[in-house]
Each structure stands twice: as C-alpha cells, then as structure tokens.
Amino acid sequence: MGKVLTMAMPKGRIFEEAAGLLRQAGYQLPEEFEDSRKLIIDVPEESLRFILAKPMDVTTYVEHGVADVGIAGKDVMLEEARDVYEVLDLNISKCHLAVAGLPGASWGGVAPRVATKYPNVASSYFREQGEQVEIIKLNGSIELAPLIGLADRIVDIVSTGQTLKENGLVETEHICDITSRFIVNPVSYRMKDAVIDEMAQRLARIIEGEETS
C-alpha cells in the first residue's frame, strides 16, 4: 500500500455526485460508501481516507493539512479565500449565486439590507456595483429574510429556482456560476505529488470524456 491520501468531502448532494465521479475514475469504493454514517471512512484497498465535513468546512481542513485534497464548491472558495490550490473544475453540482427578493420590491433606505450566508461574496459584489448595502449574515433559511422584513434582498445559491418560487421570491441579478472543484493542500502536493497528480488526471479524463460525448 502506498502513501494514504486523505480527502475531505462535503456531506450532502455534492458528496453523492463526487463519489460517482470517483467510481467512474476507477476508484473502488465500498457499496455502502454513500450510506455510511461515519465521519471518517478508510478505503485501504485504494490507500484513501475520506473525511466527511460540512461543505463550508472542507477548505479549512485542506488549508490546515488534516486533509491532503478535497472537493469544495466554488461558492465556498470565494467566500473563505483559503490558501489551497484549485487544481480542477469537476463540473458537478452546477448552480449559481444570485441576488433575489420579492417581486416589485424596491431597495429600502440609504443602505438596503442584504441577507446571506456569503457575506464576503455579497460585500464584494455590491462594492463592484457601486452600491452601499448592509450585510446580514445568516446560516440557513435565507429565503425567509425578505418575507419577514429582515432584509430587502438575499444573496444565495440557486439551483433550479424552485425554492425561490415556492417562497414568492424572484431572481434579480446573476452573480456567478458555481461548480465543485478539486483542491489540494500546497504542502501535501509537495509530499504526495505523484498520487495527487494521478487522481487529478483520472478525474480529468472522466470530465473531458463527458464534455466531448
């Protein structure tokens, strides 16, 4: 068995898509991999260890070296700005960051309020637009903010738009497209460059094949 590579994976939808991509790339993951309730999963046959983390924490684990590599959404990378290498766009978990609010609602006051779990991204975006806003940090149920008068607008991830629609909100501005990325700890890359390069190349072949098919 070679050097064990530790990979941080986000729990939830991205995890399932990423596991499927790893299998397509030829990694033999156990059948119960996606259904496991463990937070650390060892796959000795592939010299792999997986750490299952909250999506917003993956870049932290990779930056601090407890994981050599990881899979993280571009939204998290933009918000956290961690010291990691972004090696590959995996082209999975496609969505986008957007501004949304109640239809026909006007901006309120001198500094309208914007609720989001991406305060850094939102601040940067509105600064670039030349708009002064007050950012309100929330950790979930962002769509609730305009409905109860907490904020004039929200900045959040939009996938199908169904959640916005169900809450009577409309998208007003498209900020940027989001996909999941293969990221690497800089020190780990110096120590385990061969095995990391192999994983990146195997994943890249699958992605390139899907794009040309």
Swiss-Prot record:
Primary location class: cytoplasm
Superkingdom assignment: Bacteria
SUPFAM superfamilies xrefs: Periplasmic binding protein-like II
GO molecular function: ATP binding; ATP phosphoribosyltransferase activity
InterPro entries, per database record: ATP_PRibTrfase_cat (IPR013820), ATP_PRibTrfase_CS (IPR018198), ATP_PRibTrfase_HisG (IPR001348), ATP_PRibTrfase_HisG_short (IPR024893)
GO CC entries: cytoplasm
Listed transmembrane segments: none
UniProt GO BP: L-histidine biosynthetic process
Compartments it resides in: Cytoplasm
Catalytic activity field: 1-(5-phospho-beta-D-ribosyl)-ATP + diphosphate = 5-phospho-alpha-D-ribose 1-diphosphate + ATP
UniProt keywords, alphabetically: Amino-acid biosynthesis, ATP-binding, Cytoplasm, Glycosyltransferase, Histidine biosynthesis, Nucleotide-binding, Transferase
EC number: 2.4.2.17
Gene3D superfamilies: Periplasmic binding protein-like II
Pfam families: HisG
Pathway: Amino-acid biosynthesis; L-histidine biosynthesis; L-histidine from 5-phospho-alpha-D-ribose 1-diphosphate: step 1/9
Domain remarks: Lacks the C-terminal regulatory region which is replaced by HisZ.
Role: Catalyzes the condensation of ATP and 5-phosphoribose 1-diphosphate to form N'-(5'-phosphoribosyl)-ATP (PR-ATP). Has a crucial role in the pathway because the rate of histidine biosynthesis seems to be controlled primarily by regulation of HisG enzymatic activity.
Protein family (similarity comment): Belongs to the ATP phosphoribosyltransferase family. Short subfamily.
UniProt protein name: ATP phosphoribosyltransferase
GN (gene name): hisG
